[in-house]
């Protein structure tokens, strides 16, 4: 109820370009406030989804502390007005996520997934620290308010943006994401897809202002890599037999369009990327919840065993349909608004993007339908010896993902 009331604050309050300061180092604008609200929303739903941890009593108090620590670090990342604090909390937010994956993941491979996550992110974030020191020497400030410079250096741009490309993730530096998603518990997958990937997009929105000349010169290369990578990853989605891996790769495909929109460096592109980040956060988190609900029943994430769910839990297949249709950007979901804005931005930037964008949208629909058709239709797994229907908690959890996803499309005018 408190979160619903807080969301009403967005609808009634007029956010300008300025920050609303809470202190010298903490403040909010529309972008950071929306992502803070998304963090609170997803972290609340994470606890609701992790019923098995509370029932089994497997270090449930430690789990709650971990989630709260993660929420606090995310709040401080999004509300930080100082670049050094932003960098500090950006790195700190990795620690509770690593604990969630290694502590409550199901398979022994979770250790390897933790290594992938840490090494990719930490290796990419070291150049950013060098850039921050250089920035402080040049400007004598690390406050967002005073960063009115334009660095015309490709090397500095790569130092700064590499960590955000890894976090988003961009194609070629995305290999840690499917690994982490597949091995993470449901709470880890939800927060990773819902909020952690948005740190990459948020960082780019904040920092690209410093490199407007570099982005205008070399943006075409990164847009090309993003869109081509998104198409290749969408083809990979159609070859998956693991539900969580398919949803994880679809996240890479969606975020590639967000990256391309940001690199087009237009106002519509920024708005589209922002809308798509919020929509993708709610939609992919809901899909991971659905995959986990099936996993708890069947005991496997394989699409070959999770078949014929329409015969077993017909009421759950409605939710599968709603989330798969939202994932393919069908109306009235927020994904549609984001995709329209991003396609408008990228086509106006270069008409040659039409082919790749058309292919990306078509394949998005293809793998969403593939996921729905495979899980709901066909003959159900003959090895099932007992099966129980959905709980009210699970339907509420899915409704709390779907409702804001389709309600916020009516508030598309706050740009």
Where are these regions (language model features)?
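Core, highly hydrophobic multi-pass alpha-helical transmembrane subunits of bioenergetic inner membranes
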Residues: 1-415
């Amino acid at each position: 109820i408190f979160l619903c009331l807080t969301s009403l604050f967005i609808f009634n309050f007029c956010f300008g370009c300025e920050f609303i300061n809470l202190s010298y180092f903490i403040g909010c604008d529309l972008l950071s406030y929306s992502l803070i609200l998304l963090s609170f929303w997803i972290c609340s739903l994470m606890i609701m989804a992790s019923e098995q941890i509370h029932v089994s009593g497997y270090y449930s108090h430690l789990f709650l502390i971990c989630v709260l620590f993660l929420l606090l670090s995310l709040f401080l990342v999004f509300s930080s007005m100082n670049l050094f604090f932003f960098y500090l909390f950006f790195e700190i937010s990795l620690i509770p996520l690593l604990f969630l994956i290694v502590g409550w993941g199901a398979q022994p491979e979770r250790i390897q997934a933790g290594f992938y996550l840490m090494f990719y992110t930490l290796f990419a974030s070291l150049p950013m620290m060098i850039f921050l020191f250089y920035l402080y020497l040049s400007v004598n400030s690390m406050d967002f308010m005073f960063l009115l410079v334009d660095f015309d250096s490709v090397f500095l741009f790569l130092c700064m943006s590499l960590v955000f490309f890894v976090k988003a993730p961009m194609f070629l530096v995305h290999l840690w994401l499917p690994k982490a998603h597949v091995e993470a518990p449901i709470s880890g997958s939800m927060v990773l897809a819902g909020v952690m990937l948005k740190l990459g997009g948020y960082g780019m929105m904040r920092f690209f202002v410093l490199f407007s000349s570099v982005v205008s010169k070399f943006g075409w290369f990164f847009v090309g890599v993003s869109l081509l990578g998104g198409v290749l990853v969408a083809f990979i989605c159609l070859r998956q037999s693991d539900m969580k891996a398919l949803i994880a790769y679809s996240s890479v495909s969606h975020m590639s369009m967000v990256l391309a929109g940001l690199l087009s460096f237009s106002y519509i592109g920024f708005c589209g990327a922002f809308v798509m980040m919020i929509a993708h956060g709610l939609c992919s988190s809901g899909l991971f919840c659905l995959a986990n609900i099936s996993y708890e029943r069947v005991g496997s994430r394989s699409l070959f065993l999770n078949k014929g769910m329409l015969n077993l839990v017909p009421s759950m297949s409605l939710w599968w349909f709603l989330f798969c249709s939202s994932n393919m950007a069908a109306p009235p979901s927020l994904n549609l608004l984001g995709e329209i804005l991003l396609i408008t931005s990228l086509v106006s930037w270069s008409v040659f993007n039409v082919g790749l964008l058309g292919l990306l949208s078509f394949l998005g629909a293809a793998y969403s339908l593939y996921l729905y058709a495979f899980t709901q239709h066909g003959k159900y797994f003959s090895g099932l010896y007992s099966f129980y229907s959905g709980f009210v908690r699970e339907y509420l959890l899915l409704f709390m993902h779907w409702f804001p996803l389709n309600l916020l499309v009516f508030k598309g005018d706050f740009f």
